[in-house]
Amino acid sequence: MNVATAASPKNQKSRILIADDNGPNVELLEAFLADVDCDIEIAVDGRDTLDKVAKFKPDLILLDIMMPKLSGFEVCKKLKDDPATSGIMILMVTALNELGDIERAVDAGTDDFLSKPVNKVELIKRVDNMLKLRHVTDELERLRRYIQGMED
């Protein structure tokens, strides 16, 4: 089953942004997502991530915490504080796995947290669940606007 297409409306490909400054980590995540029918874009630092979000409009971001220019915590907070980007699902994928790091990630607004080294099966399951949630949320919002329009 191709995960992202099954989760997306009208069989549109889901869009995933991988934000990590470490080339081998990016290559590993791309390889793990090879069987997922999705479009992938790469960002190499925090500022690049914000720029790519504006252009690529991802459904999901796999976000490293320790990046140059802006940390993953800062990027996540900026995205979740902005109504235009707050609905983007964020999965922090990081070597930081202390309780304090997880708390900071949650405080910044992350939707989920995955510690490195990443297990392929776990990553795919989380990506699948997050994309399904994103698309269901989008559909609920579309229906809410439709019903509201009927009442006006």
Q: Residue locations for each model-derived region?
A:
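Non-catalytic signal-transmission and effector/linker regions of two-component phosphorelay proteins
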Residues: 1-17, 30, 142-152
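Two-component/phosphorelay signaling modules centered on CheY-like receiver
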Residues: 23-44
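Active-site beta3 strand of CheY-like receiver
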Residues: 56-62
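Receiver (REC) domain active-site loop signature in two-component systems and cognate sites
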Residues: 67, 90
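C-terminal output helix
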Residues: 100, 118-127, 131
